[in-house]
Structure formats: C-alpha cells, structure tokens
C-alpha cells in the first residue's frame, strides 16, 4: 500500500527546495549589489525591501519543519533587510543634520528630486498614492502622530491624509514661492506641507489646524529641525487671521459650510491684495466654481490646481 503521507511530504520538500532555489538566486543578486547601500539609491532600497518582504515576510526562522538550508536563506534575507533599513536611517539622519546646519535649500531638494525625470517634476503623476520621496520626507521629519481615537472632528472635516511630496514640489514650482510670500496651509494636519515649504524655499509658512495634538507634533518637528520661518496655529480655519497670506493651500480638509465660509473669507482677502489659492482633491471642484478665481490650467482634482484672483 502506498503511504500517501510520505508522497505528500516528499512533494512538499521538493516544492520547498525549488522555492528556496529561486529565493536563493534572488537574494544573491541583492547581496551582490553593493551600490544599494549608497545614499542616493533610496528608491532602489525601498523596492528591495518590498521584494524581501514579499518573498520572505512572515517566515519563522525557528520553524523546525523547515530545512536547515531554508532557514539559513531566510536568516540572510533578514540580515540584508536590517542592513538596508540601517542605510535608510543613516540617510534620514544625514538629511536632518543638513537641515539643522541650514544647508536645506540645496541638499534636501536635490535628494528628494534625485532619479525623477524632468517631466515628472513639472507634471507629476495624478492621484493620491505615495512614492519613495514620501518615505524620505517621512524618515526625515519623524513626526509623532497622535492616536486617532482621541481626536474629535466635525462631520464636515475630512480625515487627515498627508499631501504626496510630488504634489508639494509641483505646488512650489507652480507658485514660484519666494522670500516675499507667506504660504498658508488651511487644515495643515501634521504640517508636512508647511515644513517642506520652509525647507526648500525662502517663503514664510503658516499651518492652521483645528486639532491641537497635530499642531503640537508639527511644532516639535519644526523645533527639532531648527526651522524658523514657519508657525503652526491650533485654530478653526474660519476664525483664523488670513491677512498676511499670499498663497493659500487646501487639500480638501473640509467641505460643506466650512469650505463655503473659508472661501468667502479668502474672497474678502482678495479685495485687498492679489492672492493665489492652490487646491488638491475633491474641493477643487468647489474652488473652480468661484467666479472671482481663475485657474491657471484645467482644474484636475488629482493634481495641484493653482487659482489666481481675477
């Protein structure tokens, strides 16, 4: 009589051997590429880490049912992942040190734009997904995120999502932010946009955010990086003093009557001086319907749209 358990066991072992062979070849390729540890290869490291997680994630190296060779391969993968993560951490700390020393205008912008083609800098991919530049900025800012259940919000306030870095860079380029500008982020959340604007331009930045816990985190970050050209205020955007702003940004932080009231306040500001309003997300449709504003390009909720006063 044929022992089916033996057949199943043998088939399982053969499958494991074949799988281990493929993973071994893949791992050898990564281990042989010493350039992965170079600071500017962040994007490639992040891809490699994702691939390692896909191939080896969830593996228990103490699993006695695995062969010794299989466990050794997975231990190598774990060690390589640790090495790549350490290279990322070293890069983040290096950029933080550059910013603290005041070298941010050149070094930081150069690093986050590395390996990005010129057309993607001018007109980045639409949508709200993230890429390696967001990983870099997140690693550099090291923002402390408050626990969501402790936050209270109005039904007209949209849950916080950070603006993808590629769109922030597009905003900076499209508005040509300079030393005479005051950039105001209405509903700034953890402060990603004002922080980045302060790092790579000479403009003053102001983040207005109703959630005090978010403001506290943004202030901590600005202080740790010694950024002096920005402020964060815990305040409802409807009650904020907007008199100093020249460029205003809305990443659909609220809708309904709140958005209507804020746009009315901005219209009053536009009677006193020329201003620009930049939008991203669903609120773009509402902003585009304001007759006192003119879009610089066809409004697109998936990209930054810049509006000038008419």
Indicate residue ranges for each PLM-predicted region.
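Conserved SAM-binding loop of SAM-dependent methyltransferases across substrates and taxa
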Residues: 192-201
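Conserved SAM-binding strand-loop segment of SAM-dependent methyltransferases
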Residues: 227-236
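C-terminal substrate-binding/active-site "lid" region of AdoMet-derived donor-dependent transferases
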Residues: 257-310
């Amino acid at each position: 009589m044929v022992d089916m358990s033996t057949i199943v066991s043998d088939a399982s072992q053969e499958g494991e051997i074949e799988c281990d062979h493929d993973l071994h070849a893949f791992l050898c390729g990564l281990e042989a590429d010493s350039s992965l540890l170079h600071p500017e290869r962040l994007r490639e490291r992040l891809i490699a880490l994702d691939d390692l997680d896909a191939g080896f994630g969830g593996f228990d190296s103490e699993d006695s049912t695995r062969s010794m060779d299989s466990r050794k391969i997975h231990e190598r993968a774990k060690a390589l992942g640790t090495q790549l993560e350490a290279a990322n951490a070293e890069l983040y700390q290096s950029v933080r040190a550059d910013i603290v020393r005041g070298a941010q205008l050149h070094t930081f912008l150069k690093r986050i734009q590395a390996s990005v083609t010129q057309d993607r800098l001018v007109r980045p991919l639409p949508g709200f997904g993230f890429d390696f530049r967001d990983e870099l900025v997140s690693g550099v800012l090291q923002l402390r995120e408050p626990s969501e259940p402790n936050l209270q919000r109005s039904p007209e306030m949209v849950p916080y999502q950070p603006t993808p870095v590629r769109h922030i860079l597009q905003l900076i380029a499209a508005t040509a932010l300079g030393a005479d500008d005051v950039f105001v982020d209405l509903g700034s959340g953890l402060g990603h946009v004002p922080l980045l604007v302060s790092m790579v331009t000479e403009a003053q930045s102001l983040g207005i955010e109703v959630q005090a816990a978010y403001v506290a985190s943004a202030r901590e970050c600005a202080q740790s990086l010694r950024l002096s050209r920005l402020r964060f205020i815990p305040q409802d955007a409807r009650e904020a003093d907007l008199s100093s702003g020249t460029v205003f940004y809305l990443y659909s932080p609220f809708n309904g009557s709140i958005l209507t009231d804020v746009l009315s306040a901005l219209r009053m500001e536009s009677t006193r001086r020329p201003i620009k309003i930049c939008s991203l997300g669903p609120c773009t449709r509402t902003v585009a319907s304001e007759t006192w504003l003119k879009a610089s390009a066809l409004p697109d909720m998936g990209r930054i749209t810049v509006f000038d006063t008419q």
